[in-house]
């Protein structure tokens, strides 16, 4: 094993938290149980890493083995990346082809390697008939950079692929071509949907967010105590408050459902509109360029935050459709223009 590969193993193992080390190594399944028992996991991490690299060398580890370990680490820490969603479509009249995962992998890899001399492509099968693809990009003159790979998660026989955001935007057309041809689709477009939470993106595009998340029973009637009402308050006011709070909860439930929402961190709205005024000679009356403004809502869990606004009395119910349509439209980037 040369020094470059040994260093790649060392840096990959070094970033694994000690609390996850054994779990990830066993998932990798490259070292035997007996070999792992020879490692003292109570010593300094640098020493542990060195012992593990020696075991990799003893087992004649390859670059593909290192790539598999990196994929597993990324699967455990998928939320550290920002994921984009791509949607593919077939040409009108195209028949539905039988899908073969091995054929998909072979075709995908060949397309990239024919177009680009220096590229490393590795695959790892995952749950729900999905495959994780790790791509280390190089150029015609530089070897692949193993420390800044791109990731693609593709679910077989679906038109959706999820990709980690990459700085190498110039490679996106090639990646799109490889996905489209290998999956036997006709064209591919990037959706206006992005998040760190891959499972939530999947739930949105596959319309699973009302099934795959745990549901909660919200049918219990509201009691005066749960509404925070003062028992000494006028009974008519109590009744009015109770009716309004029940209405707010009913409307919120109709819009968002009983289930926890998919996790998104932001929604962005770009407004572009022509200036309109009944006053002649206004400052902006002759302006040809439209007025532009950008509004961004952000929260660790945006949809749950939006769901709680009306019940908390912060906003009126129902909320604007621009805020509540995010899961159904499958987008959290919006462009609003004049009709």
UniProtKB/Swiss-Prot annotation:
A Gene Ontology BP annotation from the UniProt entry: chromosome segregation
Positions where Phosphoserine occurs in the chain: 226, 235
Keyword vocabulary terms for this entry: Centromere, Chromosome, Kinetochore, Nucleus, Phosphoprotein
Principal cellular location given in the protein's record: nucleus
Localisation: Nucleus; Chromosome, Centromere; Chromosome, Centromere, Kinetochore
Gene Ontology CC annotation, any one: nucleoplasm
Domain of life: Eukaryota
Pfam families: CENP-N
Keyword rRNA-binding: no
InterPro entries, alphabetized: CENP-NAC/CAD_complex, Chl4/mis15/CENP-N
Assembly and binders: Component of the CENPA-NAC complex, at least composed of CENPA, CENPC, CENPH, CENPM, CENPN, CENPT and CENPU. The CENPA-NAC complex interacts with the CENPA-CAD complex, composed of CENPI, CENPK, CENPL, CENPO, CENPP, CENPQ, CENPR and CENPS. Interacts directly with CENPA. Identified in a centromere complex containing histones H2A, H2B and H4, and at least CENPA, CENPB, CENPC, CENPT, CENPN, HJURP, SUPT16H, SSRP1 and RSF1.
Function: Component of the CENPA-NAC (nucleosome-associated) complex, a complex that plays a central role in assembly of kinetochore proteins, mitotic progression and chromosome segregation. The CENPA-NAC complex recruits the CENPA-CAD (nucleosome distal) complex and may be involved in incorporation of newly synthesized CENPA into centromeres. CENPN is the first protein to bind specifically to CENPA nucleosomes and the direct binding of CENPA nucleosomes by CENPN is required for centromere assembly. Required for chromosome congression and efficiently align the chromosomes on a metaphase plate.
Family: Belongs to the CENP-N/CHL4 family.
This protein's name: Centromere protein N
Species: Bos taurus (Bovine)
